[in-house]
């Protein structure tokens, strides 16, 4: 093993960035095949290669940080900066959807009937399933904070309970969102209202699924004694991401469901 006189982790050559990029290419190609030719073969293959890449890449990161001790304080600081920049990029990603929504709703064109929601669109009642979804996500924000505080206090059992509650609330939110989509009286092809509604809420739903997966991995790692009160950036990053998902939903609820209806 070569000697190094610095605290930074010099990452070994890894195949996972390459397989990840190829999997992403397969995923986008598979989606195009599914949309235009109704074939899910390439999409299924891409999901499999994506899952294998993520599992093996994250496995290597866990080995480097938990078992080999490569995640020193400067390395953790860099990871924190990376996560902050990632969440910032996600904020701008959703800002584009809000821009599209407000651009269309604040000055409706004559083609939309000159008012919002457009003529012929029956919006969802914001006081029914959307309000329940809001309550579920806010409750999950409380439980993830409870899990974080329990971890800081070395209370292992409470941390596991709170994290499990958060994951279950995330799954419940996803199921409610799916049921809402099936019951919606409009579709993604119903003009600007349908497209902005389903794209904005759909991408948020995708982020909830990603966040739930992130938290499930953290739960497994906690069960395997990977986290301590001093060394748990994986969980901290997941908690940041979950709070971001919470805040985005509040903006979606106020803008699209409540004001937009």
Curated annotation (Swiss-Prot):
Signal peptide: none
Membrane topology: Multi-pass membrane protein
Membrane-spanning segments: 16-34, 41-66, 73-105, 129-152, 156-183, 191-223, 233-256
Family: Belongs to the cytochrome c oxidase subunit 3 family.
Any single GO CC term annotated in Swiss-Prot or TrEMBL for this entry: respiratory chain complex IV
Reactions catalysed according to its record: 4 Fe(II)-[cytochrome c] + O2 + 8 H(+)(in) = 4 Fe(III)-[cytochrome c] + 2 H2O + 4 H(+)(out)
Entry EC no(s): 7.1.1.9
CDD domains linked to this entry: Cyt_c_Oxidase_III
The protein's role, per its UniProt record: Component of the cytochrome c oxidase, the last enzyme in the mitochondrial electron transport chain which drives oxidative phosphorylation. The respiratory chain contains 3 multisubunit complexes succinate dehydrogenase (complex II, CII), ubiquinol-cytochrome c oxidoreductase (cytochrome b-c1 complex, complex III, CIII) and cytochrome c oxidase (complex IV, CIV), that cooperate to transfer electrons derived from NADH and succinate to molecular oxygen, creating an electrochemical gradient over the inner membrane that drives transmembrane transport and the ATP synthase.
Keyword Lipid metabolism attached: no
This protein's name: Cytochrome c oxidase subunit 3
Family annotation (Gene3D superfamilies): 1.10.287.70, Cytochrome c oxidase, subunit III, four-helix bundle
Mitochondrial matrix side: 1-15, 67-72, 153-155, 224-232
Molecular function per GO: cytochrome-c oxidase activity
GO terms of biological process kind: mitochondrial electron transport, cytochrome c to oxygen; respiratory chain complex IV assembly
PROSITE patterns, per the entry: COX3 (PS50253)
Keywords for this protein: Membrane, Mitochondrion, Mitochondrion inner membrane, Translocase, Transmembrane, Transmembrane helix
Mitochondrial intermembrane-side segments: 35-40, 106-128, 184-190, 257-261
PANTHER family, alphabetized: CYTOCHROME C OXIDASE SUBUNIT 3 (PTHR11403:SF7), CYTOCHROME C OXIDASE SUBUNIT III (PTHR11403)
